[in-house]
Amino acid sequence: MVTLATIFQQYGPAYREQGGNTLLPSHLRVMWCIEHCRTAALGGHRYQCDTCGEVVYSYHSCRNRHCNQCQLDKAEEWLAQQEAMLLPVPYFLVTFTLPQEMRTVAYANQQVVYNLLFRCAAEARQALAADPRFVGGQGGAIGVLHTWKRDLGYHPHVHFLVPGGGLDFVNERWLPARNHFFVRVEPLSKLFRARCAMG
């Protein structure tokens, strides 16, 4: 079975050589952890049967949050926690992508730019949700940062799972989104780009 670890083990050296000093230390660390998860490189325990003498090795896990081999249970637990918070309303997937012009700066300043991406996306989404032409209330969201496309090209974007409506705190009521969509993409895109440009 092909796993991320086997891909990294097979193609990682060439990738690291090609990337040279443009690869971030954090990415190199993740690759190293995944490549060596549950291998002798991380140490382990040796168990031996008292009856037949059979020896079995149990190697340590890397415990890196990006490792799908040893952290799958935690990922599934997180997903179950998020599902438990869902309201009995329709939901929308809203995606915000960092403008192409900002990606070189983003790659060199990831923490600052990713925080900016989340903040600008959340503010734009909330501003339009509060607009009575769309929802007219305060909405919620669960956001997840993705930094790569399927072909592993650098492509920072945030996915928000957004309930189809919002709370009107003045009248203490739920306001459902209209016309089977959350907000219109054109004004949302413009507002998001303007907020990104302002920083």
PLM feature segments, named:
Residues 1-199:
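Beta->alpha loop/short-helix hinge microenvironment recognizer with preference
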